[in-house]
Structure formats: C-alpha cells, structure tokens
Amino acid sequence: HNTMNDVIGEYPNNPSSNDQFYDDGEIIRGLFSWHGYHSSADPPENLGGPDFGGDGHLGAAQFVGVATLHADTSPSNNSNDINQPTTTWFITSDDPTTSGNLQYNGTKSTKEYVDYMTVGHPEQSHSEIVGTGNANQFNDPRTGSNPGGTSQGIGFGPYDLEPGDSIRIVLAEGASGLSRSMCYKVGQNWKNQVHTDELPESSDLHQHMMNNYHRSSDSHSYYKNAWVFTGVDSIINVFKLAKK
C-alpha cells in the first residue's frame, strides 16, 4: 500500500526540472517506484524499510522502473515517436474497474479504455500528490478510494491498425539502489546514530527527491534517507545503460 510512483519525460517539448536526459540529449521517458511512508510504521521512519527491531539494516532501499526506448510513430512509420507514451496515469488496485476480469463486459471495457488506457498525463504524478504524506492513505481522485495500493500505468497510441499491421514498442525494465553491504552499513549507522555526517554525493535529481519526499521534521533520518534516495540516480543509470 505504500508504493510511491513517479514519472519523468511526459512532455519532451516542455521538460520539467526533474526530467533527465540520455548522453545524446534525448529525454528519458521513464517511470520509477520506491518504498514510501506508511501510517502504521512504528517508529514512522520507514523509508528504505529499516529493521527497527534488529540491527537497522535496510530491506527496501531499491528503486524499480521502466523506460520507453522506442515506440513506432505508426504502422507505416517506424521512426521513434518521442511523444509516446501518451498515458502515464497511476492505477489503484482492486477498485471496481481494475478488479475482476470481465473482457466481454462492454461497459467495463469502455471504462478501462477511457479511464486508464487513453486518459493522458495527470497534472501531478502519484508521488507528487502524496509528497511527504503516507502513501497508504492516498485515495485516487477519480474514485475516492484505494483498496489495494497504487501502481504506475503506461499507455501508447492511439494507433490505427489494419489486419496484419504491427507496432514496435521497446521497453527497458530495471531495479537498482544501494548494495546489500551498503544497506547494512547505512541502516546500522542510522540506528546507532553514528557516522551520520558521511552523506552521499548529491545530484539535482537526488536533491529534488530529498526536497519533496524526505520529511524535513525527521532530522533523525536525514542520513538514512539521503542514502536511500541515491537509488533514483541508480535507476536513471540503468535506463542509460539500456539505451546503449
């Protein structure tokens, strides 16, 4: 229930401050997710999934994500359409539209197509709406509920396909973040409050994550969260490697 989802590169012609770019200057069209705050965490410092009752090691410091490397412009034009994907709305699990497979229900299928597959880009991503709040308490503004947590959606098109036509879309999936040894080192240092001045090298994107998703009131966890959010640069590097 506490997954956080963000999207970058939705508007190639009008990049936002947190958008990223490949070495050749092309915008990265990506989405990534991480372990966010949960209202039931006790103590409420659960970014990175620290082992509160044990040695403090981090059990959920990784970022997972997907990047669009290529999407055909049309069935007859295989040039890369930089404006794809055209839909990046988040999706709440187990609500009436996303639960129950009723492929022959025309009403439900139409709602899936209109509300999820072709809905476009939200004004704010899921993570931008949640901010430093508890991700498990987020409610989808379209339904007013969130029974099963939030996932990131992605949709391409629309394409007009005749019989025999095809579209080529290339995606890269990845996961990255702190190594196992660093998860233990950072978590143990955090729990014992030692060496907390040993902060990671920051980037513009890393600072964006700290500014928007670290609770400034939680000075006790600044060190831990600073290391956890290095995972965002790690997943961007995975996307760049996939492009090569």
Enumerate the predicted regions with their spans.
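Extracellular/surface-associated beta-sandwich interaction domains
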Residues: H1-K244
